[in-house]
UniProtKB/Swiss-Prot annotation:
It is found in: Cell membrane. It comes from the Bacteria. The chain crosses the membrane at residues 49-69, 78-98, 102-122, 124-144. Residues 165-189 are annotated as: Disordered. Belongs to the chlamydial CPn_0442/CT_006/TC_0274 family. Keywords: Cell membrane, Membrane, Transmembrane, Transmembrane helix. This is Uncharacterized protein CT_006. The keyword 4Fe-4S does not apply.
């Protein structure tokens, strides 16, 4: 019996492993809709703390993905008796391998750099990890807010739908002056 739920893509498997706060934020989304100020405060604090730890947890979770994703893919293949559910796990395994390889290359290349360059790079990496963690939390905590048009856009859409009378001037496109100005008057402004 085919399932009506869309399969989770490989990149989602990978991001859910590397950013476990995505899963927690999606789970807590109904509460965040009720208490948005408290949710933003908690999300900011969690993003800051988890972002600092992300420099350590990212390579560890990528390495764990090299073992977890193939096993979950095999279990999915055996459970569904087809290779259709396995492709997402294969992609997630390759994403884990690629991310771990880039991390190892970055660490090894840091050996040849001067300490005056390494420490600012570490602080930039921590800042990037914190921002990315906050972004992952926010987008999964408030998923309904992503596609709502802003109020100014609603006003523009409503104004575009109103019928215009021929006698009312169009304020968006002012009419040209009917009198021709002399060349000296045109350049004096």
């Amino acid at each position: 019996m085919p399932s009506t739920v869309a399969p989770i893509k490989g990149q989602d498997h990978f991001l859910n492993l590397v950013f476990p706060e995505r899963v927690a934020a999606a789970y807590m989304s109904p509460l965040a809709q009720k208490y948005p100020k408290a949710a933003l405060s908690i999300a900011s604090l969690a993003g800051f703390l988890l972002g600092i730890l992300k420099l350590i947890t990212f390579p560890v979770l990528c390495a764990a993905g090299l073992f977890v994703f193939p096993i979950r893919g095999l279990i999915s293949c055996l459970f569904h008796k087809s290779f259709q559910g396995c492709s997402g796990y294969v992609l997630a395994t390759f994403l884990s391998l690629f991310s771990l390889a880039l991390t190892i290359v970055g660490i090894v290349s840091c050996i040849t750099w001067a300490p005056g360059f390494i420490f600012p790079m570490i602080s930039v990496s921590i800042a990037f990890a914190t921002v990315e963690t906050c972004f992952q939390i926010y987008t999964h905590l408030f998923p309904a807010l992503e596609h709502k048009p802003s109020s100014s856009l609603k006003i523009e859409i409503a104004a575009a739908k109103l019928p215009r009378s021929s006698s009312a001037p169009d304020l968006n496109y002012p009419s040209l002056p009917t009198q021709s100005a002399s060349p000296s008057q045109r350049f004096s402004a």
